[in-house]
Amino acid sequence: MANTLEQLKLYTTIVADTGDIEAIKRYQPEDATTNPSLILKAAQIPEYESLIDNAIDWAKSQSDDLAQQLDDASDKLAVNIGVEILKLVPGRISTEVDARLSFDKEQSIAKAHKLVRLYKEAGVDKSRILIKLASTWEGICAARELEKEGINCNLTLLFSFAQARACAEAGAYLISPFVGRILDWYKKDTGKDYDAVNDPGVISVTEIYNYYKQHGFNTVVMGASFRNIGEIIELAGCDRLTIGPSLLEELANSQVDITPKLVAATSTVAAEAPLTEAQFRWDFNQDPMAVDKLAEGIRNFAIDQGKLEVMLTAKLAN
């Protein structure tokens, strides 16, 4: 009997949620995703020292202004790590726009253009990149514009049906609903434990997946942020699942019989009128879990971006 990970790959595209090249070599995912927290973690791996040095040298060659150097070094490092990962995966790398731009559509678009340009200069076509944006109204609007330019987007920090619907209506290439963080909120709020079948995060992704397929949306559903392999097994059949190294290892070392739990609808229903900004904001605001977790997620990514910049500032000063 094949291990659980190999069985899962029969029904779902597996993506590595890491910037660790050794982990990617080991589990052979199709794609990989990074975020500010993972870039910070990867930057502390000794093997990446040369990538950091390259980013610092490049940033210094672009400007004499320290703030600009810091911005450039941060972007270049994320791209350098992405380029290394793309040598190992046949598919795409997701690289995230600075979380501090989550409420600024124009600046998010400008940052996306810069990341795409840096990848192009490194010999990577935009067809192998997904630009990650927070699923705020502004992030979703930025994605709509970028998709029209042929720049595919991964809408992240997604916790609610309203966010998922707006992303699909904007033509986003892919969404990343956060399974485990939804579970975290409900466990804390109710004091209860949930098995995988009744896991609120699993239920949320299942609802979104079914809605997309029934309404003929092409946006890819990629479940993210898992707390245990039970959640992953319950989402077998989802378009994609992005999984961290520890859970990839657990899946590879277990033998659970996998059957697809999510199956695409064969018939579609008519699309509804797209959400207006007012409707989106109201529907989103009605979900206290989503409001809490989106705000927390943006804050935490911004904190880790700040920590990375402290590290880069010290190197720029040398």
From Swiss-Prot:
Per UniProt, the keywords (alphabetical) are:
Cytoplasm, Pentose shunt, Schiff base, Transferase
- Write out the catalytic residues in the record: K132
Instruction: Name the source's superkingdom.
Output: Bacteria
Q: Name one GO biological process term.
A: pentose-phosphate shunt
Q: Tell me a Gene Ontology molecular-function term this record carries.
A: transaldolase activity
Main site of residence?
cytoplasm
Q: Which Pfam families match?
A: TAL_FSA (PF00923)
Query: Which compartment or compartments is the protein found in?
Result: Cytoplasm
Per the record, the pathway is: Carbohydrate degradation; pentose phosphate pathway; D-glyceraldehyde 3-phosphate and beta-D-fructose 6-phosphate from D-ribose 5-phosphate and D-xylulose 5-phosphate (non-oxidative stage): step 2/3
Query: Which reaction does this chain catalyze?
Result: D-sedoheptulose 7-phosphate + D-glyceraldehyde 3-phosphate = D-erythrose 4-phosphate + beta-D-fructose 6-phosphate
Q: Quote the InterPro entries the UniProt record gives.
A: Aldolase_TIM, TAL/FSA, Transaldolase_1, Transaldolase_AS
Q: Name any GO cellular component annotation.
A: cytosol
Q: Does the keyword Transferase apply?
A: yes
- Which EC number applies? 2.2.1.2
Q: Which NCBIfam families match?
A: PRK12346.1 (NF009001), talAB (TIGR00874)
What binding partners and quaternary form does the record give? Homodimer.
Q: Which family does it belong to?
A: Belongs to the transaldolase family. Type 1 subfamily.
| Biological role stated in the UniProt entry | Transaldolase is important for the balance of metabolites in the pentose-phosphate pathway.
| Descriptive protein name | Transaldolase
Q: What is the lineage of its organism?
A: Bacteria, Pseudomonadati, Pseudomonadota, Gammaproteobacteria, Alteromonadales
